[in-house]
């Protein structure tokens, strides 16, 4: 119902995110693509990332960008979208069933197998208001303490910018020695 409401309100582009997990929903790749393409929505597959609170992520059970693309290619013709935003996390693909039938686009956020850290221009805010330069950052800034301490807007901007500038430009998720931050988003 939520998707229908957003669609009826005319909010576009409507993007639907899906995390495909081995032995859970691998069979949903093509039905999700069909649904989104039929309705003019942009589907974005996201590689499963080590974000859960119980540190249960297993790299060997992750469905990769290549596996998703291979499944999509069984039904669709995929052409890379070379006009996209270079800082966007998703790699976009133009999708068509055949040359006579217009398709749409599908994005894949492959933050594990094809990290985009070097071009990332994002910061994150945790549920309790801390600022991080990456989902996997171990350091945070606390703008609330600046506000509560009487700091100015410029002080907040300075702290936020400082956190963003310490971005290591590599989270190392796909490295053997990767350690998930103790505190999750």
Placement of each model-derived feature along the sequence:
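Intrinsically disordered, low-complexity sequence elements enriched in Ser/Thr/Gly/Pro
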Residues: 13, 42, 120-122, 130, ...
């Amino acid at each position: 119902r939520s998707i229908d409401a957003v669609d009826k309100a005319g909010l576009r582009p409507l993007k639907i995110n899906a995390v495909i997990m081995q032995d859970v929903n691998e069979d949903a790749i093509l039905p999700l693509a069909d649904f989104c393409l039929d309705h003019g929505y942009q589907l974005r597959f996201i590689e499963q990332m080590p974000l859960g609170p119980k540190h249960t992520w297993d790299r060997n059970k992750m469905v990769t960008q290549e596996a998703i693309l291979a499944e999509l290619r069984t039904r669709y013709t995929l052409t890379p979208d070379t006009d996209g935003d270079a800082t966007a996390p998703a790699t976009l693909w133009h999708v068509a069933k055949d040359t006579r039938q217009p398709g749409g686009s599908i994005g894949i956020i492959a933050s594990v197998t094809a990290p985009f850290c070097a071009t990332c221009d994002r910061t994150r805010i945790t549920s309790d208001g801390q600022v991080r330069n990456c989902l996997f950052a171990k350091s945070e800034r606390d703008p609330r303490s600046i506000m509560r301490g009487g700091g100015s807007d410029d002080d907040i901007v300075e702290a936020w910018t400082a956190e963003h500038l310490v971005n290591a430009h590599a989270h190392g998720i796909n490295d053997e020695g990767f350690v998930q931050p103790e505190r999750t988003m």
